[in-house]
Amino acid sequence: SYSELIKLPYSRLPKLFAVKALDAVVFNVPVDPLRPVDKRDNYVKRCMGLPGDTIRIVDRQVYNDQRLMTLPDRSNGQFSYYVRTNGQGFNPGQIKRDFDINYLKNSQVNNQNVSDVLQITQTEFIVTIPEQALEAFSAMMHVDTVIVINALASHQFSEGTPEALIWYYNQAVKPMPMYPNPMGGHSDTTEYAWTRDNYGPLWLPSKGSTISLTRDHVLKYRRSIEIYEGHEFREVNGSYFIDDEPATSYTFEMDYYWMMGDNRHNSWDSRYWGPVPEDHVMGKPVFTFMSWDKYAKGMDKIRMDRLFTVVHGKGKPTSYLLVFLALVALYYGWEIWHKRKQSRQ
């Protein structure tokens, strides 16, 4: 990882289980070209699309081959909302305790610490709210209006849209180019007028599938051909060349997956850098040993209800912490008894 002079072949252990739709998945982030695949940052996102599927997002809802993808029980879906109050602000401690919303001071906000609350005017805020807390949050006495933020492909707003919401959209949402538009581009000049809330359709390549090399396909899949599958790709006078050979089609060598975060409006995921190739997938998280809330105080930093829980499954997760502590106590009890027995002998 310190030099490009020596490159060892990249090999992987065979997989034990296949990735399924809606699984939480651990993978190496694809957009980190300066480091080898296995040295790139590990991300955990939810698989919303499998190889061969077609992904489309309509009004924040994800569709896979026209089937609505509903998040499982143990997910934590969140969106950002425009919130207007009667003039009273929010108490950071209260909304953290009641809704698990992190309201950080400006001095605390950086690339690693993002506040769930952005105050725009004296009475107007952008708030990221967990779906299960939305109804209770909206019922707070001093909350007058709650509007979900839905970025339209047209970048247009209906009559009566609050000026503060338009300002936030133009400053924080609109400038973010969606894949397969160039990352250095701008939403006013992009090829695909897609947004984080209205996206696609985009087909996910599967191993062995073949596409014709049209302009649309080249824009969408050139990154897979060049970066992930390692072929030289050139366009000369409207004709395409792969590894210096004329090409009118391409057959994919890997499967690709669509990964998205449950916090849809604060997630760096496939909407921005495209499908994840199979050689970047590490596995699935199975068990939560420790869950740490860096924004809480004191012992509240440890999320006791999440310790020793199974990641996948139906209903609320069951903590096996007491079972673990009992096993530890039995082990040490046996150790003490065994040593005493040996000393007597």
Task: Tell me what each language-model feature is.
Residues S1-Q345:
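Extended hydrophobic leader/signal-anchor segments used for secretion and membrane insertion
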